[in-house]
């Protein structure tokens, strides 16, 4: 996911390892890790409480760090020490384990998680496409299932929407600083009911301000 768009095709260049920051979409659907040289993600969005990052690195890319790379950022060192070169973030590791067990045992795997996420996102996108007050600027095939962006008729209305939404219990809807508008983050932990209530609020706001 980049700002408000989600990559559909994975670019492949022969001889060039692909490195991806998957913080916004990891564990939201299956990923073919063999297509990547390195996958990096912070756990704070879809995995566990903030405080840890995870890297999946292809074996042939290890052992080539320059001498200027700090020890704490050298994946070869971290791997050799079983990720415990320094004191590990125990709480984050524990919570990550619980989430992984939940995804496997309760959800039934990432294929099912993907279906749930696509269904959640569809509720919000269908609403956005069915009226003209709020707009989503992203081409359909590049729409993110994790971060749904939208705008109202003007920036002042965006501010009013965010303020009234916060009063109604919908927090952190202000969009990315580079693109403005609003951004609804509907990660794995967001239940379908949360998306439905947001849509209900958006419709009430639209009727009151259109």
Map each language-model feature to its residues.
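Catalytic PLP-binding core of fold-type I/II PLP enzymes
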Residues: 5-34
